[in-house]
């Protein structure tokens, strides 16, 4: 079963009474456990597609199904609740709250899960920091961390609810080469060892090369696909 299933997705914005077509009948399937990179020039629809998958934006028409849930049919309240449980967000800029420690930042998504005690929230946040290799930085504030460490905290925050899908928008775009490499290694580990489905937008071919599949977009449609799984099979 596809973890993400996008069918006939269209997204149209109005600008000065003109229709701006951002997604034009998009179809995309991402199997459970797949790591997919979305590439294309600016304005090709990559981030809009990612936002529709994550339930941040609503399409004009078409359907988005994630983990068996039809995201496009949910009310605003139900959609917010669904996002908090089933999607983990990783952004180019880390969006950490500067007055909170690393572990407190990671705990934030858990505040929406009312069935957890304070102790359980703290334990899960510490576990997530351990997964990203920052258990020893739990009490550090963002200003005391490097950019790569801040992004690791942001990734811990993304995985702390054990979401069905991780959506990443240019996760290495604000990092130096070494930190970017470390973050991509971590994302590969989350995919391979923790079986996380990942949909990542990137302009960087080196980042895209870590994914199982590259999907190329232009003017709101998929124009090409590169599967590294097939390439590996073909060389055996």
Language model features: what each stretch is:
Residues 1-12, 223-236:
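ABC-family P-loop ATPase nucleotide-binding domain
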Residues 2-217:
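ABC family nucleotide-binding domain
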Residues 214-226:
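H-loop (His-switch) and adjacent beta-strand-loop-beta switch element
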